[in-house]
């Protein structure tokens, strides 16, 4: 497999600062062309819009059978070998003539007495087709097919059976007949039918006469329903951190009827092997963080176009992604303990072993819940000074810039709110504009018994709403700036995606007086505030009120209530 970018990127690295973040642009007018960077692009159009990447669209009068073999398609005849007494290689060579565009060659079935010889053409992709034509060479006009049955398969229904058994007798029931004639008198056969997706064509002779096919041609219109583009491994010249990826899309046809699916994988070898990462989950939109492992030297993109209709398509002008040199040669990180009670603040030790640090002065840890306290930071077993920036779902801890090999260990208190929480971490170098470097889970130190970054909690039933608390228990919304509102805190546990949560205020008669803004919320610690006003904006009378928290999950509705006093 070819590799793109080594000379270009090595030059860029020499003129850039050591930790500078940069952008790699593919396509458009600024970077390597889409065609230059292509490893596979069987039904991609590079020509109609220079600099753009788009799926092939069938134009009127263009024969889509041409190029079938180059796209990975085939032409086979499961029963011709016995009839014609040809070797496998010679038969394959002769069958290929029906799509080679050479009018001096043909596939011939002559001087035999058998009927029912048929061939199957795989276009290598699905196309919108409404017209199929076949004919003999001009110098053999009388050797046309005197009887035939033509049928097609759309590449979806039973297509796996057809594709898996091209050298056997494909089941006729998997094909739909679009044309047949027992007494054909035309040398050029044109079969026309309603526009539809076609991938496989089955053509059978039903008469005992000499015949040949110069070309089997298919015509139609519209975008192919699926098209995939695969880059060669893009060489960044050295171990690299990945940033965000963006692209400039353009849609043709109906909104929502065409899609773009982009995945990445990374490695350190120029050829794809077992050391490369698997394909990432699809990137859901432009300006999303690349999730494939780093630092790695090479990255590969797979871009898939999908369309729900012949007139619906999508194109992209260019694709760019951020990258910067690695902040460390390698990392290993683990957390302890790895099994705790749900929703209870626990002291954790987060250890990171760093090899080849180059100016690292920060560690960011995702916890999923607020960090209550940072207790200490140790570098190589020695307590050191640090700064902290706690957040609602994590912690940023800063320290003096580090070079070389070190073991970092930070102790902090937080709660775990879902069954398996991964405490991902990133190394930072604030003295540069380098991208963060994600730490890799592993055995960072023998002082901790774990070897990964996952923390689990016991699963006891399906309760997802915990620790509903009101602060203060009584408040006076009189506008003096003191105790003017109540803060409603609650934990949502065990969820893998956001679900509807509502917070309502009721008086003691059961009448709802206020609904706080409903929202979809995932696992985490959440806060709502009530300022003592009803839904009409009026201050409620003094008295006791019920705060009602309700959450909707696929296991049903869960509720919890607390009381609060409004006083003046």
Model-derived features with residue positions:
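Positively charged n-region of N-terminal signal peptides that target proteins for export
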Residues: 1-6, 568
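Detector for intrinsically disordered, low-structure N-terminal pre-sequences
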Residues: 2-3, 98, 563
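Beta-sandwich/jellyroll recognition modules and their flexible linkers
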Residues: 3, 225-226, 552
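Bacterial N-terminal signal peptides
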Residues: 7-16
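A detector of low-complexity, intrinsically disordered, Ser/Thr/Gly/Pro/Ala-rich segments
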Residues: 12-13, 412, 555
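Beta-strand-rich ligand- or partner-binding modules
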Residues: 21-460
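Short loop/turn motifs at secondary-structure boundaries
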Residues: 404, 455-568
């Amino acid at each position: 497999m070819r590799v793109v970018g080594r000379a270009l990127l090595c030059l860029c690295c020499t003129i850039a600062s050591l930790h500078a973040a940069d952008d790699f642009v593919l396509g458009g007018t600024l970077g390597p062309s889409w065609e230059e960077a292509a490893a596979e692009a069987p039904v991609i159009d590079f020509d109609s819009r220079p600099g753009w990447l788009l799926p092939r669209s069938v134009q009127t009068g263009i024969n889509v059978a041409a190029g079938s073999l180059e796209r990975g398609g085939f032409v086979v005849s499961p029963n011709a070998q016995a009839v014609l007494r040809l070797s496998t290689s010679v038969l394959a060579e002769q069958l290929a003539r029906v799509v080679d565009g050479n009018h001096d060659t043909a596939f011939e079935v002559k001087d035999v007495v058998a009927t029912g010889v048929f061939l199957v053409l795989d276009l290598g992709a699905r196309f919108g087709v409404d017209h199929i034509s076949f004919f003999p060479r001009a110098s053999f006009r009388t050797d046309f097919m005197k009887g035939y049955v033509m049928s097609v398969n759309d590449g979806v229904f039973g297509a796996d059976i057809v594709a898996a058994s091209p050298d056997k007798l494909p089941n006729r029931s998997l094909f739909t007949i679009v044309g047949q004639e027992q007494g054909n008198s035309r040398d050029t056969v044109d079969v026309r039918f309603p526009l539809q997706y076609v991938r496989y064509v089955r053509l059978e002779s039903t008469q005992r006469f000499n015949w040949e096919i110069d070309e089997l041609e298919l015509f139609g219109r519209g975008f192919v329903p699926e098209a995939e583009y695969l880059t060669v491994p893009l060489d960044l010249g050295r171990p690299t951190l990945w940033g965000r990826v963006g692209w400039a899309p353009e849609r043709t046809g109906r909104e929502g009827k065409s899609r773009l699916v982009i995945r990445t994988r990374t490695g350190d070898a120029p050829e794809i092997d077992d050391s490369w990462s698997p394909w990432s989950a699809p990137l859901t939109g432009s300006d999303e963080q690349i999730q494939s492992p780093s630092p790695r030297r090479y990255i590969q993109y797979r871009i898939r176009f999908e369309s729900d209709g012949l007139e619906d398509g999508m194109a992209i002008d260019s694709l760019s992604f951020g990258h910067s040199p690695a902040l460390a040669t390698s990392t290993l990180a683990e957390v302890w303990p790895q099994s705790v009670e749900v929703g209870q603040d626990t002291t954790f030790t987060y250890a990171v072993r760093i090899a080849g640090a180059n100016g690292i002065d920060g560690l960011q840890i995702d916890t999923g819940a607020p960090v209550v306290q940072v207790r200490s930071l140790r570098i190589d077993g020695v307590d050191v000074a640090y700064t902290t920036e706690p957040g609602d779902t994590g912690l940023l801890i800063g320290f003096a810039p580090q070079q070389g090999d070190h073991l970092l260990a930070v102790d902090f208190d937080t709660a775990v709110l879902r069954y398996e929480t991964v405490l991902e971490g990133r190394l930072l170098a604030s003295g540069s504009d380098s991208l963060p470097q994600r730490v890799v889970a592993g055995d960072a130190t023998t002082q901790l018994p774990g070897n990964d970054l996952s923390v689990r909690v016991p699963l006891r039933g399906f309760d997802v709403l915990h620790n509903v608390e009101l602060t203060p228990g009584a408040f006076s919304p009189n506008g003096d700036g003191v105790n003017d509102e109540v803060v409603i805190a609650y934990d949502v546990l065990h969820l893998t995606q956001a679900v509807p949560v509502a917070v309502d205020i009721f008086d003691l008669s059961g009448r709802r007086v206020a609904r706080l803004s409903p929202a979809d919320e995932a696992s985490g610690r959440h806060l709502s505030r009530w300022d003592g006003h009803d839904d009409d904006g009026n201050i409620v009378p003094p008295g006791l009120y019920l705060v009602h928290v309700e959450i909707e999950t696929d296991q049903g509705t869960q509720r919890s209530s607390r009381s609060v006093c409004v006083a003046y």
